[in-house]
From Swiss-Prot:
Belongs to the frataxin family. Keywords: Iron, Metal-binding. This is Iron-sulfur cluster assembly protein CyaY. One of its GO terms (molecular function) is ferric iron binding. The lineage of its organism: Bacteria, Pseudomonadati, Pseudomonadota, Gammaproteobacteria, Enterobacterales. InterPro entries: CyaY, Frataxin/CyaY, Frataxin/CyaY_sf, Frataxin_CS. CDD domains: Frataxin (cd00503). GO terms for cellular component: cytosol. GO terms for biological process: iron-sulfur cluster assembly.
Length: 106
């Protein structure tokens, strides 16, 4: 993967997260802010989820209260380089725990 392909994929990921949160009708207030290559989800309880790009590695990193995860793009999806879990699964689990109600990005 080259840098422009990585940026296209990461931009698509950011856009999908933002669109899904805009369409989400849960009781919790989840704010989404994008600043440069960093996307921050802020929850009512003050906790945050940080998603950022690691361009030199062509990875997306996810930081949650439960821990940090690094994702490589494989077979058309972002996969954790340690556990093999999918990005969307880990993001939904973390967002659900931090929001105190079920959150879906799919």
């Amino acid at each position: 993967m080259n840098d422009s392909e990585f940026h296209r994929l990461a931009d698509g990921l950011w856009m999908t997260i933002e669109e899904r949160l805009d369409a989400w009708d849960g009781d919790s207030d989840i704010d989404c802010e994008i600043n440069g290559g960093v996307l921050t989800l802020s929850f009512e309880n003050g906790s945050k989820i940080i998603i950022n790009r690691q361009e030199p590695l062509h990875q997306v990193w996810l930081a949650t209260k439960q821990g940090g995860y690094h994702f490589d793009y494989k077979n058309d999806e972002w996969i954790c380089d340690r556990s093999g879990e999918r990005f969307w699964d880990l993001l939904e689990t973390a967002a659900t725990q931090q929001a105190g109600e079920a959150v879906s990005f799919r």
